[in-house]
Amino acid sequence: MVLNRFPLPAIALALAALGLAACTATPTTTPSATATSVTQTASATPTATPTPSPTIDADQAAALEVAESYEAALAKVRADPAKYDQYKMIDLLKPLAYDDMIQANLNGIRTWRDKGWHEEGSQIILQRDPGQPNSMSNGTTKVSVTICKDQRDLVVVDKNGKKVTAKAAQGPDFLKNTYDMRRSKNSESFKVYEFGGDEVDGCGS
């Protein structure tokens, strides 16, 4: 795993924050928070149809739901960055992530928006696994969620539809994302507190 703490280099931040590359984006503040197919076009919202999975408890299910919603939200942004300015992105991500993660995404998408890039193609979620809930000393509940996906069909194109070869637009074929999901003592919802990614050869069963 490639580990980084803020501030990240611009390219690494762009990839990590957008959920496309093997990096970790770690916030600097303390919070006060199976196979699934995901299909995406330049303007379509990815959809997911979960298949049967082992029994999980309410906290695991809630954390997994938010992690998947976060992935879907970022897919919307990557498919049409011009549609999501800073304020629309904040509105989209505020229910799903802590402020430092939102800022990382704002920084990460800026290059795409400025250059007229967007993402086309489809990705397939091959594994989704919520870990056991942990109760922290401050009353926060923590769940680690792993999502492994096949990104081989994804392509970043410019405003003319030409494939972008710049490093800031490249991601691995298979990516295993690990989300540190946290729900603070007085909150009803989990949010993404920390994000990490591993480039893998494939997603095992």
Predicted feature locations:
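Bacterial N-terminal signal peptides that target proteins for export
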Residues: 1-12
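Bacterial signal peptide processing site
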Residues: 24-27
